[in-house]
Curated annotation (Swiss-Prot):
One of its GO terms (biological process) is translation. It comes from the Bacteria. Belongs to the universal ribosomal protein uS19 family. Pfam families: Ribosomal_S19 (PF00203). Protein S19 forms a complex with S13 that binds strongly to the 16S ribosomal RNA. This is Small ribosomal subunit protein uS19. The keyword rRNA-binding applies. Keywords: Ribonucleoprotein, Ribosomal protein, RNA-binding, rRNA-binding. GO terms for molecular function: rRNA binding; structural constituent of ribosome. Gene3D superfamilies: 30s Ribosomal Protein S19, Chain A. GO terms for cellular component: cytoplasm; small ribosomal subunit.
Length: 92
């Protein structure tokens, strides 16, 4: 079920503060975050976030098409190593 419109998008408060500080200073640093649940806002466009995937930080550079989605959608948590080989074929 989607979030109610009257509640608005969820973003951790410290994330907005970090973006505003970088906007004032004019620097283009990576913003390190564990907040995969935060929604991407229009003020985030052009910034690069390091989003934690449980093991390491994945760099995510935000563009206009990402607005409204979550930061965690762009740093996958699982790696696919392929299906196991068919053991019946190897025996022959």
């Amino acid at each position: 079920m989607a979030r109610s419109v009257w509640k608005g998008p969820f973003v951790d408060g410290y994330l907005i503060k970090k973006v505003q500080k970088l906007m004032e200073s004019g620097k283009s640093e990576m913003i390190k975050t564990w907040s995969r649940r935060s929604t991407i806002l229009p003020i985030f466009v052009g910034f690069t976030f390091s989003v934690h995937n449980g093991n390491k930080f994945i760099p995510v550079s935000v563009n206009e098409e990402m607005v409204g989605r979550k930061l965690g959608e762009f740093s996958p948590t699982r790696t696919f190593h392929g299906h196991g080989a068919d053991k019946k074929v190897k025996r022959k």
